[in-house]
From Swiss-Prot:
HAMAP family: Ribosomal_uS15_B. This is Small ribosomal subunit protein uS15. The lineage of its organism: Bacteria, Bacillati, Chloroflexota, Chloroflexia, Chloroflexales. Residues 10-22 have a biased composition (Polar residues). Belongs to the universal ribosomal protein uS15 family. CDD domains: Ribosomal_S15p_S13e. GO terms for biological process: translation. SMART domains: Ribosomal_S15. Pfam families: Ribosomal_S15. It comes from Chloroflexus aggregans (strain MD-66 / DSM 9485). Residues 1-22 are annotated as: Disordered. PROSITE patterns: RIBOSOMAL_S15. Part of the 30S ribosomal subunit. Forms a bridge to the 50S subunit in the 70S ribosome, contacting the 23S rRNA. One of the primary rRNA binding proteins, it binds directly to 16S rRNA where it helps nucleate assembly of the platform of the 30S subunit by binding and bridging several RNA helices of the 16S rRNA. Forms an intersubunit bridge (bridge B4) with the 23S rRNA of the 50S subunit in the ribosome.
Length: 89
């Protein structure tokens, strides 16, 4: 379920704020979104994998907390991330 190194570096390059940025909320949300999408595909095939379902719920909660933080600090960056990732809210 982990992201490939190339996928991860590509996502970081797309959402980083400066050259050495790897931990900004935008980057973290983008990485979590990709992991969530992979888990959703896994669960479509393996319907009864409840351990992975719990992990998915934890990732969604972590992403929600990061988005709440970003929304409270900078609403414009929040909207940009939501629109670029195609998330509802």
């Amino acid at each position: 379920m982990a992201l490939e190194k190339e996928e991860k570096s590509q996502i970081i390059n797309n959402y980083q704020l400066h050259e050495t940025d790897t931990g900004s909320p935008e980057v973290q949300v983008a990485l979590l979104t990709e992991r969530i999408n992979q888990l959703i595909e896994h669960l479509r095939v393996h319907i009864h994998d409840h351990h992975s379902r719990r992990g998915l719920l934890k990732l969604v909660g972590r992403r929600r907390r990061l988005l709440n933080y970003l929304q409270s600090k900078d609403r414009e960056r929040y909207r940009k991330v939501i629109n670029s990732l195609g998330l509802r809210r």
